[in-house]
């Protein structure tokens, strides 16, 4: 049997890293003898998270472009040239059969170098609105795996495969883990649990909202798992108490999802895909600070299917407490949201993506 080699690149945030790890895990299941190498950006979270998942990773000296003129921006051409050279070296030495990119700074130079070397590449686009890197990479990519319809205006139509986004397999059937999850966090099994997710780095506006509403939550007998993000943990750890679990990063996502009765979340593509699998009532608060407001578009797709509630940051002060209290009191609404969001789940997305990769071997 041929011993295949795969290079994967995805990083910057959990939304790019975990899809890459999920794809690697599925490839490993199907090709136990395969060799894997990840390529990330130096000093980004993938340099920790990928080795924790059991894979080797090499770092490139690369960063994104800022929106204003900075020293970092002036360094960008040098970093890009350096990363392209290093990517070529990595590819020449490792000799991969296929290179897979799930987004993040390092995937650009890596897939560009692979395409130039004639190695098949697969782009996995999580969002309803692609970033500039994936638009450029799509020209040479062999397949583009997407999670949303109507992306023909960004990518060559003949290369697009609608697969859904890869999700962690431990999120399937989380209902069986509720008792274990409640015990793990030292929660009261008789109280409603609110899970607050601001993304792996954190969300300032969501943190401000939770701080403001904290006493309101506690007065309604709600306990909270509050993932404030590593950027904000020092500011909010003082609120940690029996009924408020403040954490910077969540390692066991299956446990927090299992414990949750209601979830407040950003609407990054990977989070949305996970929440569809999990099937809990969700209030989406999209980040307005993203390209083409794609988080709002991600959330609207769920709201149109009557599977979630959407509140813009500008609406939080006037509407959040009313909307949250109404949802908390309405079991019928909670069940309706859960049932509808679950209909949008694609639990086999990772397997479908791997089938596309296998076609290139």
UniProtKB/Swiss-Prot annotation:
Main location: membrane
Gene Ontology cellular component terms for the protein in this record: plasma membrane
Topology class, membrane: Peripheral membrane protein
Pfam families linked to this entry: Glyco_tran_28_C, Glyco_transf_28
Reaction(s) the record says it catalyses: di-trans,octa-cis-undecaprenyl diphospho-N-acetyl-alpha-D-muramoyl-L-alanyl-D-glutamyl-meso-2,6-diaminopimeloyl-D-alanyl-D-alanine + UDP-N-acetyl-alpha-D-glucosamine = di-trans,octa-cis-undecaprenyl diphospho-[N-acetyl-alpha-D-glucosaminyl-(1->4)]-N-acetyl-alpha-D-muramoyl-L-alanyl-D-glutamyl-meso-2,6-diaminopimeloyl-D-alanyl-D-alanine + UDP + H(+)
EC number per UniProt: 2.4.1.227
Signal peptide: none
Keywords, alphabetical: Cell cycle, Cell division, Cell inner membrane, Cell membrane, Cell shape, Cell wall biogenesis/degradation, Glycosyltransferase, Membrane, Peptidoglycan synthesis, Transferase
Residues that bind UDP-N-acetyl-alpha-D-glucosamine: 13-15, 127, 168, 200, 250, 295
Any one GO molecular-function label of the UniProt entry: undecaprenyldiphospho-muramoylpentapeptide beta-N-acetylglucosaminyltransferase activity
Pathway annotation from the record: Cell wall biogenesis; peptidoglycan biosynthesis
Highest taxon, organism lineage: Bacteria
GO biological process terms held by the UniProt record: carbohydrate metabolic process; cell division; cell wall organization; lipid glycosylation; peptidoglycan biosynthetic process; regulation of cell shape
Record-stated family: Belongs to the glycosyltransferase 28 family. MurG subfamily.
Stored HAMAP family: MurG
Function: Cell wall formation. Catalyzes the transfer of a GlcNAc subunit on undecaprenyl-pyrophosphoryl-MurNAc-pentapeptide (lipid intermediate I) to form undecaprenyl-pyrophosphoryl-MurNAc-(pentapeptide)GlcNAc (lipid intermediate II).
Listed PANTHER family: GLYCOSYLTRANSFERASE (PTHR21015:SF22), UDP-N-ACETYLGLUCOSAMINE--N-ACETYLMURAMYL-(PENTAPEPTIDE) PYROPHOSPHORYL-UNDECAPRENOL N-ACETYLGLUCOSAMINE TRANSFERASE 1 (PTHR21015)
Protein name from the UniProt record: UDP-N-acetylglucosamine--N-acetylmuramyl-(pentapeptide) pyrophosphoryl-undecaprenol N-acetylglucosamine transferase
Organism: Flavobacterium johnsoniae (strain ATCC 17061 / DSM 2064 / JCM 8514 / BCRC 14874 / CCUG 350202 / NBRC 14942 / NCIMB 11054 / UW101) (Cytophaga johnsonae)
Gene designation per UniProt: murG
